[in-house]
Amino acid sequence: MPTLESNGATLFYQVTGEGSPIIFTHGASWNHLQWNKQVDYFKDHYKVIVWDVRGHGYSSLPEGPVDSENFSADLIALMNHLNLETAVICGLSMGGHISLQTAVRYPERVKGLILIGTPCSNTFNLYEKIFVPINRISSKLIPMKISGKIQAKMLSRFNPENYHYITEAFSMLSHDKWNRVWSAVTRMESKKDLHKVKCPTLLLIGDQDNMTNHQQTYMHQHIPDSEIKTIANAHHGTNLDNPDAVNQAIFDFIKKIS
């Protein structure tokens, strides 16, 4: 099982195919298996890299509070480990925010940026300022099995197979690790840094994603060289709900910037 060490954590990763590199970063509570349909689609023409963010899947999490700055540092450590000067990076939700912060903090390393259902802030509006702290508390009180089932049911409307994957991904997380990671994730803020993104950017949003859609127009307006596309028949698990449309959008974008 390929791993690397980064900032006190052992990180799992997987490389498939040869060619220009694309790195996919998964959403919170999920893992690298989220991208199976993308790996299968792109592996014949690109070097496809997936990994488990610290505290998720097969990656470890050091004791103590989690510093969200380590997320983007880990992604760069992965690139260094694989001797990649630049890459196209893609992420969904938390993984998108990690990718966004990587493009802001390490602009010379990012050739293109793909953000799927991605927030730039956890205090974007009054609702989030009230709801996110409540969500942090509730995540400490609700058992992981129940949290997993709630999320799986909500995100299985367009693809029933999502239910099994999401509950399995949740089962790999301990309650302690999840709460420490979630505390860090929900404090990530990039709203004031969007203008610092220097690479071409594609924003993808599911037409039924009511979790992050309110931020997408703002991000498109403030990321200089960006375009936005809506993915039909998709909720927040956009690449799981409509992988064909997501794959085509990513393929077209990469071809355009190559």
PLM segments and residue spans:
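N-terminal cap/lid segment of alpha/beta-hydrolase-fold proteins
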Residues: 1-10
